[in-house]
Amino acid sequence: MKNKILTFLVAAIPLFALACQKSKTTDTSAKVDPPGEKVKYFKNPVINGDHADPYVAQRDGSYYFLATKGGNIAIAKTRAMSQLNLANETVVWTPPENTDHSVDLWAPELHFLSGKWYIYFAAAQRGVNDSNRMFVLENDNADPTQGEWTFKGKIFDAANDEWAIDGSILTIADKNYFVWSGWENANEKYKQYIYIAPMLNPWTLSGPRVKISSPTNDWEKWEPSFLGAGVNEGPIALQRDANSPIFVIFSASRYSSDNYCLAQIELKKDGNPLMPEDWINKKQVFTKSDKNMVFGPGHNGFFTSSSTNDKGEQQTENWFIYHARNMPNNPNQPRTSRIQKLTWNNDGSPNFGSATSTGVNIPCPIDEQ
């Protein structure tokens, strides 16, 4: 199935979200290289409205933002992440009716593999409970907001064709693996695990799924008001550089809980990603902040920002994007997309810091300074 692309403006930017303008108050100014220049600021959320399950891809100086739309898949393209709210959003694909992927299009991710763009997304059959599965689209245009997206089909383990969402790509030594969140079987509904499988090509698995994370801790089992079966979802790969440890960052507990959070598992040195025992060091890494009114932070993506200083040295920052709510005990409140800088611990593990309040000045990514 191929779809022509439609483009429209995301939303008018409000007065309070003037992204990365020079600060007008001297008390919030800071120095950057070269000395004497004022830092530019932005405020979260970086885009208006409900944008759950945010994801960012980047290539050739452009950032591509995706989030759950439900009925279609759209991409917003920008050169500056702090100005995402000004970006044009392009609807790149709308599913046909009466298929196994016609509704509930969730958590799309955009990846550039083997010279082409691929979108991985969850979807379901209208009127059929628990029919959520993962699917793949392909586009050979250099710009994923242009050209045609071709439906490649369902990506799944044929021996274990179970409920599946939140698919992503993990690449190790030029080999791609598919990671996702799913059920063990239909008799154990609503308990979500993280699975991994090797890939034959960008739309086909070459081996059976392997479970690499199970919700065993209380912090992985929060529903809005009680402990449930447990949820691990939204897996995404993270590695500082080729000599650093490999992590899968995932979201834990039910998305509607204030205690929804980010967590990690780490592939041990020289470990086999298809061996469950080689995934170690599970722990929470980013949680709610009652003080800063950030609740249910999770389902994140990553991007980098780079700039060359006047000495010819390249400086690179790591950032993450995530969704959260700004009111407690309100599971139906829209989830907004926010970005924060990611730093690193001495052992190569990520340091997400604390969740930052909305509406406060945050220095822009370095490529915007």
Where are these regions (language model features)?
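Carbohydrate-active catalytic/glycan-binding domains of CAZyme proteins
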Residues: 20-369
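Bacterial Sec-dependent N-terminal signal peptides
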Residues: 1-32
